[in-house]
């Protein structure tokens, strides 16, 4: 597509064949009305319901306005977003789910917040949700935890509708279930201006939700991971080495105290107790062993961090 693009819209999808024509038409209608030069990047995460065939038909209608990537198998939403971000060239990059629950009508206002108000990232907030209670309650608890841990005052971290300055998506790496924590990744990458806009949420029109307890558990594990990696990911030795050294010193000091105490009692003819009969002795030895192991863990982490290949390698067999 010739010329500079105002907007890239990245749409990760899995088995959403019914909603794709309506979504593409909606995005086109909004962007055409606002005279935005735009592209839509649909990333098919290994769908088995004919979604790719629908995308091929849409490509014939919309031409260069539509790009598409097809994964050979299902890798997850983070993988789809990562590949979409790599392909995006628009000045502002949007993400939205393919299930029609995110409204493209929000695009102009969210873009203005980035372009005119200077935000690096604007996240949607679905204040009034049309999801089942079993999805809303865990989501509320998750958002509270993420807010507390990160210090970012967002009400809806997991909203699929987000707007980014292009430099943000080109500076972060998402994998696992990290798509939930892109605002946290952006903050730790140095992008401090993170805003929120209340958006209209719609009930799912086609298909069924892919939400499940397994995803919730993985999300919490990734929250721990992203917090740790943001602080120590570049140098694991800072964490493991420091903790290991502290444990080793504590164990060594305790051992010296036990030995010194025994010598003192021998010199002064005081009652002695066998070192092996003292629980403190075993705690000291345990601390020394743990200290050495933690130090070695930090060293191995450094080696892996310095020599690891790119973790985001996904097999794609089709591109449009």
Which residue stretches match the model-derived regions?
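N-proximal low-complexity "stem/linker" segments adjacent to membrane-targeting elements
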Residues: 1-29, 36
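Hydrophobic helical membrane-anchoring modules
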Residues: 2-3, 184-320
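Donor nucleotide-sugar binding loop of glycosyltransferases
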Residues: 16-19, 47, 77, 103
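Acidic helix N-cap motif at the loop->helix transition within catalytic regions
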Residues: 18-22, 49-58
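Short beta-strand/loop segment that forms part of the nucleotide-sugar
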Residues: 24, 36-47, 69-70
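A conserved acidic beta->alpha catalytic loop
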Residues: 44-53, 100-101
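Acceptor/aglycone-binding surface of glycosyltransferases and processive sugar-polymer synthases
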Residues: 57, 69-73, 77-87, 92, ...
């Amino acid at each position: 597509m010739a010329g500079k693009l105002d907007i890239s819209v990245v749409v990760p999808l899995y088995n959403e064949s019914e909603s794709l024509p309506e979504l593409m038409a909606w995005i086109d209608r909004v962007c055409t009305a606002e005279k935005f030069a735009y592209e839509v990047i649909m990333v098919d995460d290994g769908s088995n319901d004919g979604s790719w065939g629908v995308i091929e038909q849409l490509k014939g209608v919309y031409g260069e306005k539509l790009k598409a990537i097809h994964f050979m198998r299902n890798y997850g939403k983070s993988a789809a977003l990562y590949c979409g971000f790599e392909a995006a060239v628009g000045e502002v990059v949007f993400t939205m789910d393919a299930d029609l629950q995110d409204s493209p009508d929000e695009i102009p206002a969210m873009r203005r917040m980035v372009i005119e108000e200077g935000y690096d990232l604007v996240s949607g907030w679905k204040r009034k949700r049309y999801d089942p209670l079993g999805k809303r309650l865990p989501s509320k608890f998750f958002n509270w935890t993420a807010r507390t841990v990160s210090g970012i005052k967002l009400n809806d971290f997991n909203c699929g509708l987000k707007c980014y300055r292009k430099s943000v998506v080109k500076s972060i790496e998402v994998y696992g279930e990290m798509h939930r924590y892109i605002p946290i990744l952006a903050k730790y990458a140095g992008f401090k201006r993170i805003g929120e806009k209340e958006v209209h949420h719609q009930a799912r029109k086609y298909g069924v939700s892919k939400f499940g307890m397994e995803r919730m558990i993985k999300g919490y594990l990734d929250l721990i991971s992203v917090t740790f990696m943001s602080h120590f990911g570049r140098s694991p030795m800072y964490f493991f080495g420091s903790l290991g050294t502290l444990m080793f010193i504590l164990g060594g000091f305790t051992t010296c105290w036990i030995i010194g105490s025994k010598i003192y009692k021998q010199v002064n003819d005081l009652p002695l107790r066998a070192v092996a009969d003292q629980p403190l002795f075993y705690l000291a030895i345990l601390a020394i062993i743990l200290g050495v192991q933690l130090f070695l863990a930090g060293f191995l982490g450094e080696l892996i961090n310095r020599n690891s290949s790119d973790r985001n390698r996904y097999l794609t067999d089709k591109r449009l």
